[in-house]
């Protein structure tokens, strides 16, 4: 008797080589972890650590402390992807994200968040101190749950209020080194806190229709683009003022003052340019520059510290 095979009964299998599937999974993990954003947060935490009084901790211990902060920050980003997956699927900028696209299930993503979050917390408990671990956990809860689950959907001031969680890394870096709270690192927190609204409002101006479609009450959606442009200029000026304070209290020297002044002059110029000629190009130009601004500002802080000027 001839053997017959029902071709319809044959289930398709993944023919991609294992190395390709592993690479794709790694790319998805990096995407839901917001690797580039977390790298920026770790940079600011590192500068906070570097500016703290030297207590003789080794570089290896400092590295593990920063890694712990980074892993908890990445866990918060993953939770954000899960909570926002339905919103992300409605927005052109985010609809190809792994969870929104269905490449990773919510359960898979949350399991990944739990693993890296627990690992980061243990690192901070063992190689930093309890205060750093608790503060970093609070920052995770603030971003992943208070901001993402509530504030983002509730008020046009979502970025202003929720920005505190994302501004914490310099304080976390400082506390990981000293084990104590201090006034000085709060100035660095205030810089990021003040930087956050114009950074995100510039993006929201360029992507207003996306946010409106997803029913996210960003400022340009609820109050209009013209009012939002005015707020961007106002916060840009406020940012320039806040950035002077590390120099005024002796936390930094002339290199920082000159560098910060130049960066903020460009920031204000681009904000005014957006105010006078608002379109997607000017909005995205400010958004992209704001990322460079924050990164270079903190690098200058570090250089200034170690040149002792």
Swiss-Prot record:
Q: In which pathway does it act?
A: Porphyrin-containing compound metabolism; heme O biosynthesis; heme O from protoheme: step 1/1
Gene Ontology CC: one annotated term? plasma membrane
Catalytic activity reads: heme b + (2E,6E)-farnesyl diphosphate + H2O = Fe(II)-heme o + diphosphate
Q: A single GO BP annotation from the record?
A: heme O biosynthetic process
Q: How does it sit in the membrane?
A: Multi-pass membrane protein
Enzyme class (EC, first level) = transferase
Q: Where in this chain does the entry annotate a coiled-coil region?
A: none
The UniProt keyword set, sorted, is: Cell inner membrane, Cell membrane, Heme biosynthesis, Membrane, Transferase, Transmembrane, Transmembrane helix
Transmembrane stretches, by residue range?
35-55, 59-79, 107-127, 131-151, 159-179, 186-206, 238-258, 289-309
Has the keyword Lipoprotein been applied to this entry? no
Localization in the cell: Cell inner membrane
Q: Name one GO molecular function term.
A: protoheme IX farnesyltransferase activity
Q: Which InterPro entries match?
A: Protohaem_IX_farnesylTrfase, UbiA_prenyltransferase, UbiA_prenylTrfase_CS, UbiA_sf
EC number(s) on file = 2.5.1.141
Recorded hits in PANTHER family, A to Z, give:
4-HYDROXYBENZOATE SOLANESYLTRANSFERASE, PROTOHEME IX FARNESYLTRANSFERASE, MITOCHONDRIAL
Query: Anything else the record notes?
Result: Carbon 2 of the heme B porphyrin ring is defined according to the Fischer nomenclature.
Q: Which family does it belong to?
A: Belongs to the UbiA prenyltransferase family. Protoheme IX farnesyltransferase subfamily.
Q: What is this protein's function?
A: Converts heme B (protoheme IX) to heme O by substitution of the vinyl group on carbon 2 of heme B porphyrin ring with a hydroxyethyl farnesyl side group.
Q: What is this protein called?
A: Protoheme IX farnesyltransferase 2
**Could you read off the lineage of the organism from its UniProt record?**
Bacteria, Pseudomonadati, Pseudomonadota, Gammaproteobacteria, Alteromonadales
Gene (UniProt): cyoE2
């Amino acid at each position: 008797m001839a053997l017959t095979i029902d071709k319809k009964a044959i289930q398709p299998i993944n023919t991609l080589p294992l190395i390709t599937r592993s690479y794709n999974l790694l790319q998805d993990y990096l995407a839901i972890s917001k690797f580039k954003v977390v790298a920026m947060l770790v940079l600011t935490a590192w500068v906070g650590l570097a500016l703290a009084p030297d207590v003789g901790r080794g570089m290896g211990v400092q590295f593990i402390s920063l890694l712990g902060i980074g892993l908890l920050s990445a866990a918060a980003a993953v939770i954000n992807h899960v909570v926002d997956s339905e919103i992300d699927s409605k927005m052109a900028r985010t609809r190809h994200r792994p969870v929104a696209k269905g490449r990773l299930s919510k359960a898979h993503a949350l399991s990944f968040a739990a693993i890296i979050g627990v690992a980061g917390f243990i690192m901070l408990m063992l190689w930093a101190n309890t205060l750093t671990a608790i503060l970093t956990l609070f920052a995770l809860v603030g971003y992943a749950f208070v901001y993402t689950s509530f504030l983002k959907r509730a008020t046009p001031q979502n970025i202003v209020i929720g920005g505190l969680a994302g501004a914490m890394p310099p304080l976390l870096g400082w506390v990981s080194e000293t084990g104590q709270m201090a006034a000085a690192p709060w100035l660095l927190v205030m810089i990021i806190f003040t930087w956050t609204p114009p950074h995100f409002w510039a993006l929201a101006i360029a992507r207003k229709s996306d946010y409106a479609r997803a029913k996210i009450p960003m400022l340009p959606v609820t109050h209009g683009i013209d009012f939002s442009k005015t707020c961007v200029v106002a916060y840009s000026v406020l940012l320039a003022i806040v950035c002077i304070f590390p120099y005024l209290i002796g936390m930094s020297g002339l290199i920082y003052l000159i560098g910060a002044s130049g960066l903020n002059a460009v920031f204000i110029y681009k904000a005014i340019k957006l105010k006078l000629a608002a379109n997607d190009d000017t909005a995205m130009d400010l958004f992209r520059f704001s990322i460079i601004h924050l990164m270079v500002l903190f690098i200058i802080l570090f250089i200034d510290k170690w040149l002792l000027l």
